[in-house]
From Swiss-Prot:
<dbReference type="Pfam" id="PF00534">
    <property type="entry name" value="Glycos_transf_1"/>
</dbReference>
<keyword id="KW-0328">Glycosyltransferase</keyword>
<dbReference type="InterPro" id="IPR001296">
    <property type="entry name" value="Glyco_trans_1"/>
</dbReference>
<dbReference type="GO" id="GO:0005978">
    <property type="term" value="P:glycogen biosynthetic process"/>
</dbReference>
<feature type="binding site">
    <location>
        <position position="17"/>
    </location>
    <ligand>
        <name>ADP-alpha-D-glucose</name>
    </ligand>
</feature>
<dbReference type="InterPro" id="IPR011835">
    <property type="entry name" value="GS/SS"/>
</dbReference>
<dbReference type="GO" id="GO:0009011">
    <property type="term" value="F:alpha-1,4-glucan glucosyltransferase (ADP-glucose donor) activity"/>
</dbReference>
<protein>
    <recommendedName>
        <fullName>Glycogen synthase</fullName>
        <ecNumber>2.4.1.21</ecNumber>
    </recommendedName>
</protein>
<comment type="similarity">
    <text>Belongs to the glycosyltransferase 1 family. Bacterial/plant glycogen synthase subfamily.</text>
</comment>
<comment type="pathway">
    <text>Glycan biosynthesis; glycogen biosynthesis.</text>
</comment>
<dbReference type="GO" id="GO:0005829">
    <property type="term" value="C:cytosol"/>
</dbReference>
<comment type="function">
    <text>Synthesizes alpha-1,4-glucan chains using ADP-glucose.</text>
</comment>
<keyword id="KW-0320">Glycogen biosynthesis</keyword>
<dbReference type="InterPro" id="IPR013534">
    <property type="entry name" value="Starch_synth_cat_dom"/>
</dbReference>
<dbReference type="GO" id="GO:0004373">
    <property type="term" value="F:alpha-1,4-glucan glucosyltransferase (UDP-glucose donor) activity"/>
</dbReference>
<keyword id="KW-0808">Transferase</keyword>
<dbReference type="Pfam" id="PF08323">
    <property type="entry name" value="Glyco_transf_5"/>
</dbReference>
Length: 485
């Protein structure tokens, strides 16, 4: 029997993406399908999403969804069922899903994503004829209210199905003032410590965590970390109270899109048995970033330029990296002061440091294929994808020991190197001594070609496809449904 799951997400590739959440939401339907799960994704009707619908068919209408007219339309996403909340007053606007064209949060985000949650709860609860689901899976705060509505205000005659709440990043919680509670259309009993109330206001993510049958994060280590004040962001007590209902499942990567043997973006394709071809990609990348061509290690960085990503410390380490024979190519954007500081570093070290501000998907592939090591000094990283891409492409990860980075990279300590299982370099603490020492370790390992090549091969042989992760989610769904019967 096929398990029918409604996946509630505010973004999903290939239709709309601002971060890693979109990669997961887009990959999940195909990942769980071989394990007896039929997944339907529901998305807000942003302009790009509506444009991608060939012939949208209306399935349901709301005359007043938090005060606005809306309809539910159907389509496909990579061959899987797609539902879209077509609510122009909420979603047909310029900018990104969450911010306007000037980069400021939409002032009515509370209302937009409450409406999305209300609609998703109606769909999951059986209000739409011909659409029945066994379980609902919500992603991050933008989808969390779906679980609160199912718990406190299911559709008339609807049923409360089991649910999963996935935390992709605890730093984003959707916390709003108490004055908006009456507009949410929830009963008075929802205003409670075990409901939507959070520090005197309304907490969207908190409400979803309280209502969920099970909570997942995107790595086992992050599932443990969010039980602590350092990573729990104020919700650690709630996470601890949920006990064994909290678990971590590492994200997979799309091995069709990220495969060095078939990648059309590369100057030279290669595999685990043809690593010598990587040098062609290295030479091409050096030329693309106006770097000197030499045999020293080329470090790459592909990231948002933010404090979370440890970029401030990386900036401190550039002189050290260059001083011991390394070079650096960076692709990213974010904090303007950090952007300017990287430009200054490139001016200070011509031919040694190259910088591209912005994001370019094809370039990110070329960097993974041409770089020798990828630096990921994040202060916290729920899962992380760039290190997984690095492993797949023989670009050895140098990572902070946190979250998914700790779960996916095997440190090149003596025992791991001797056993042939080391895949990268881990360091403890995001500060100058730790990061600079990790860079030095990477350079030392790079200068031992046999060891470095063994690390590359071990990483490339590691299975980080969605197959394993898909089975873990499918097993969780089945267990929750069995428990509910």
């Amino acid at each position: 029997m096929t398990i029918k799951v409604l996946s509630v997400a505010s973004e999903a590739v290939p239709l709309v993406k601002t971060g890693g959440l979109a990669d997961v939401a887009g990959a999940l339907p195909s990942a769980v399908a071989p394990h007896g799960v039929g997944m339907t994704t529901i998305l807000p009707g942003y302009p790009a999403v509506m444009k991608a619908l060939a012939r949208p068919r209306a399935l349901h209408t709301w005359n007043s969804l938090l005060g606005e007219k809306a309809r539910l339309v159907s389509g496909k996403i990579d061959g899987h069922p797609l539902l879209v909340l077509d609510a122009p007053a909420f979603f047909q606007r310029d900018g990104t899903p969450y911010v306007d064209s000037s980069g400021r949060d939409w002032a009515d985000n509370w209302r937009r994503f409450a409406a999305f949650g209300r609609a998703a709860a109606d769909v999951a609860g059986g209000a739409v004829k011909g659409r029945a689901f066994d379980l609902v899976h919500a992603h991050d705060w933008q989808a969390a209210m779906a679980l609160a509505y199912l718990r406190f205000a299911p559709p008339p005659g609807g049923r409360r199905v089991p649910s999963v709440m996935t935390i992709h990043n605890m730093a984003f919680q959707g916390h709003y003032g108490a004055d908006l509670f009456p507009a949410l259309g929830l009963p008075p009993q929802a205003w409670a410590m075990d409901g939507v109330e959070y520090h005197g206001g309304v907490g969207y993510l908190k409400a979803g965590l309280e209502a969920a049958s099970a909570i997942t994060t995107v790595s086992p280590t992050y599932a443990r970390e969010i039980r602590t004040p350092e990573f729990g962001m104020g919700l650690e007590g709630l996470v601890v109270s949920r006990g064994n209902r909290v678990s971590g499942i590492v994200n997979g990567i799309d091995t069709a899109q990220w495969n060095p043997e078939t990648d059309p973006a590369l100057a030279a394709r290669f595999g685990v048995k043809s690593l010598a071809r990587r040098v062609t990609n290295k030479r091409a990348l050096e030329a693309e970033f106006a770097l000197e061509a030499d045999d020293g290690p080329l470090f790459v960085v592909i990231t948002r330029l933010t404090w979370q990503k440890g970029i401030d410390v990386l900036l401190e380490c550039i002189d050290h990296l260059v001083g011991i024979g390394g070079r650096l190519a960076l692709l990213g954007s974010g904090d303007k002061a950090m952007e300017n500081a990287f430009h200054a570093a490139a001016t200070r070290h011509p031919g040694k440091v190259g910088v591209r501000i912005g994001y370019d998907e094809a370039l990110s592939h070329r960097m993974q294929a041409g770089g020798d090591a990828i630096l990921v000094p994040s202060r916290f990283e729920p899962c992380g994808l760039t290190q997984l891409y690095g492993l797949a492409y023989g670009c050895v990860p140098v990572v902070a020991r946190t979250g998914g980075l700790a779960d996916t990279v095997i440190d090149a300590n003596l025992a791991a190197v001797m056993a042939g299982v080391a895949t990268g370099v881990q360091f403890e603490g995001v500060n100058y001594p730790s990061v600079s020492d990790a860079i030095s370790r990477a350079v030392t390992l790079y200068r031992q070609p046999d060891v470095w090549r063994a690390m590359q091969r071990a990483g490339m042989k590691t299975d980080f496809s969605w197959s394993r992760s898909g089975k873990a989610y499918a097993d969780l769904y089945a267990a929750l449904i069995a428990e509910d019967q």
